[in-house]
Amino acid sequence: MAFGKSHRDPYATSVGHLIEKATFAGVLTEDWGQFLHICDIINTTQDGPKDAVKALKKRISKNYNHKEIQLSLSLIDMCVQNCGPSFQSLIVKKEFIKDTLVKLLNPRYTLPLETQNRILNFIKTWSQGFPGGVDVSEVKEVYLDLLKKGVQFPPSDGEPETRQEAGQISPNRPTSVPTAPALSSIIAPKNPTISLVPEQIGKLHSELDMVKMNVKVMTAILMENTPGSENHEDIELLRKLYKTGREMQERIMDLLVVVENEDVTMELIQVNEDLNNAVLGYERFTRNQQRLLEQKRNRTEATRTSSEPSAPSCDLLDLSPIVPVPTPNEGALNSVNAQLSGLSVSSLSPVITNNLYPSLQPQRDLLASEDIEIPTLFPQRTSQNLASSHTYDNFHSNSVLLQPVSLHTATAAAAANQRLPPLPSSHPVLKDGDLQPPNYYEVMEFDPLAPTTEAVYEEIDGYHQKEAQSHSDC
């Protein structure tokens, strides 16, 4: 830890320690060699400007020792002249000017008039700018604020010479108000102020009247228009007035620095304040416009996002209400099965069971008709093709042909078996030599130990063949 002090102490740094020693009250006079050494450290180190400004602020703030304040002001003047823009840009900040130097002008510090004038001269000179392009807007603001409060700044060293030169201006010379580029030659360290002749003052007042008119127009447009419902022509005019107002504000600030006329200075300050309010109002209006446009854009994107599905349509579930499928009752199904079982054996129509899905052709739905007809979709076997095919070759002529029935319920099966018709008389007599492949009926797997009332059907052709063989042997 350097010099036994905390890192938060501005005097703990190398340049801070040197500033503390060079501005100590025990020093008899300014040590210019030490001041130059401090300037070298500020220019050669990265944190030198920042550390130096912090140390100077600590030395001056709330210090009633006039000797230390005088030494500090001398060091500041030396650093401003010999250090670069990095130090100058920090020394002209409002934090240092207003919160440190201006507070020393308070009567409680009882500074000598010479020291007070030196502080005011610093503020006035720095507000005129630096050759390195340093931003001096904050020190200009402090300077104008002091002028508005009636603070009298001391005359510069070259002021008498400047007034004498201003009095020798030829009357034939144009009396236009100098613009900002023209003032660059006037704003010099040796000749920082000018005195205006009556013709120049009259021209300046006429231009200030134009600025006042522009301010009134800008204020009226801002009051009549609201962000989101503004008139485009008014906004275009407002934009032009804002650009012109910015340029006039720069000229007014330059004139305030160089003009040595109390009445003109007071009017310039008042016009600058009104113009600044109009400019700030336009900037606020523009920010509100941008905010409304951004909010509208966000709402549009949110609406578009909410209207789009979060997943592809193929991945979505169908939440539409399901229409219930009418299911025929059990009694109607049993009645239809019984009617089908009484048809001719030549019919191979399937027995209707309880199907959850209705027929795709309502006009052919067997449940909706009293006279049941065999659909053309199913092939029919007549007695003719029964004769051509050697069916039931292993049966006796008096054998009873079993019809395949629905296995839906035991009741339906029993009703179908009771209504089986006899074998038609036109059926040809089967011979012993005619062989027919065995017919297999539906066999269901079941547990013989499980209690059930359903009828079980199994292969019966093999049993009848054996029985017929035994009869033939006899």
Curated annotation (Swiss-Prot):
Using the record's annotation, list all stretches that form the VHS domain: 22-154
Please give the coiled-coil regions recorded for this protein. none
> Which ranges are annotated Polar residues under compositional bias?
165-178
Q: Name one GO biological process term.
A: protein transport
All copies of domain GAT, residue ranges:
199-287
Annotated tissue distribution = Strongly expressed in brain and kidney, expressed at intermediate levels skin and heart, and weakly expressed in thymus. Not expressed in liver and spleen.
Give the start-end ranges of region Interaction with PIK3R1.
441-444
Give the record's GO CC terms. cytosol; endosome membrane; Golgi stack
Sites where Phosphotyrosine occurs are at Y457
Write the record's keywords in alphabetical order, separated by commas: Cytoplasm, Endosome, Golgi apparatus, Membrane, Phosphoprotein, Protein transport, SH3-binding, Transport
Q: Map motif SH2-binding onto the chain.
A: 457-460
| Basic and acidic residues composition-biased segments | 293-302
Membrane topology recorded in Swiss-Prot or TrEMBL: Peripheral membrane protein
Q: InterPro entries of this UniProt entry?
A: ENTH_VHS (IPR008942), GAT_dom (IPR004152), GAT_sf (IPR038425), TOM1 (IPR014645), TOM1L1_GAT_dom (IPR027428), TOM1L1_VHS_dom (IPR047013), VHS_dom (IPR002014)
Q: Which residues carry this modification: Phosphoserine?
A: S170, S313, S320
Provide the GO MF annotations for this entry.
clathrin binding; phosphatidylinositol binding; protein kinase activator activity; protein kinase binding; SH3 domain binding; ubiquitin binding
Q: Please indicate which superkingdom the organism of origin belongs to.
A: Eukaryota
Region (Interaction with GRB2) residue ranges read 392-395
Tell me, in a sentence or two, what this protein's role is. Answer: Probable adapter protein involved in signaling pathways. Interacts with the SH2 and SH3 domains of various signaling proteins when it is phosphorylated. May promote FYN activation, possibly by disrupting intramolecular SH3-dependent interactions.
Question: PANTHER family annotated for this entry?
Answer: TOM1-LIKE PROTEIN 1, VHS DOMAIN CONTAINING PROTEIN FAMILY
- Quaternary structure, from the entry: Interacts with LYN. Interacts with the SH2 and SH3 domains of FYN when phosphorylated. Also interacts with GRB2 and PIK3R1 when phosphorylated.
The UniProt similarity line reads:
Belongs to the TOM1 family.
Supply the name of the protein: TOM1-like protein 1
Q: Which organism is it from?
A: Mus musculus
Q: What is the lineage of its organism?
A: Eukaryota, Metazoa, Chordata, Craniata, Vertebrata
